[in-house]
Amino acid sequence: FAVREYLTALNFLEIETPTFIKSTPEGARDYLVPSRLYPGKFYALPQSPQLYKQILMVSGFDRYFQIARCYRDEDARGDRQPEFTQIDMEMSFVSRDDVLDVTENMFRTVFKKTIGADLAQSFPRISYDDAIDLYGTDKPDIRFEMKMQDAAWMAECTEFAVFKDAVAAGGAVKALVVKGQAANYSRKKIEELEAAAKIYKAKGLAWTKVAGGAFEGGIAKYCAGVEAEICKKLNAGDGDLLLFVADAKYKTACTALGAVRSKLGKDLNLLDPNVFAFLWVIDFPLFEWNEDEQKWDPAHHMFSAPQERYLDTLEQNPGEVKGDLYDLVLNGYEVASGSIRIHNPELQKRIFNIVGFNPADAEKKFGFLTEAFKYGAPPHGGIAPGLDRIVMLMAGETSIKEVIAFPKNTFAVSPMDESPSEVDEKQLAELHLSIRE
């Protein structure tokens, strides 16, 4: 109710979009619905109302929203369900800042009205690149500080071959200073931190402890004579635990140590459940490289606009292109994602081509959208906060199953009615389907 009241006051129209739609590639697998009337053809349940809300903007609707049910056939986890609800919003003639302002004010209003929480008057912003560099994730939990630092310079001043090899290969050495925790971390507890790093492909976790100006344990012997220099550059002091990940791949070093940071936050009780720490992550890459298929994939989806400064060089180096993309993060969870959309049909065709759709395939899959653009699409953008995940965090839970009536379990099964279930042969025959063993 609070969401509807807020958006309606801003002249948003609540419009329902279809539930049976055309199957289009949007990232996750579609849930498919076979057609009885058209053998061999299928509807899909919407992963989001993305294309319909863009067509609404073309149709002259200035501001739209709906409380949308969405369906994605993907692996389950604690903060994810195969069916979920999002607050879907779209606006014409807006910039990124306009969308962010409307969204921030909505969260401030809703949190105050529902749970009496006063949120910050302005949510901080960080670029995707800085989020990876400082926190090792694009979903940083900023309820505690503990930022990662660059320590590639240690390859020069120490004798540790792991650091030297990583830097020589063009990689990185990342460091964390855990203040005052040297005495509390035994070798066994450090091995638990190392296990967290190895999940993200780190080869190991280097460490040492600061004690009386000297280093003890771990890589201490490789740092002899330069302890003071290291402590000064890392702002470390007596009683601190120093942790390092080195890797030939910069992102691996960052994400692996970022996982260690996240575990430390939990282990050291740094995650105050009564604090709501919102953060905007902006300037995402528009594309990401798919190693398995050797092609570029959209980082979010194919309808997000590149930043204007990249328009002339899109095809030359897709990996360098930043999109007009933004995510809202709350306490380490992504709670909303959005972008300024492409409204030029020729630019949309260029994006299709970069991600591997030839003109015929693009026309078959998305011709209805590019045809609509020909009638004059306004610049537009939007965002879609995930309602279930937001309620989970407001309630202090760690699984959205705790705030959903009749949730699916981690195997995507409904314990209440035991769906999915078998159907009889007559139903299958009516749908022109047969089950292969």
Model-predicted regions and their roles:
Residues F1-E437:
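Class II aminoacyl-tRNA synthetase catalytic cores and aaRS-like
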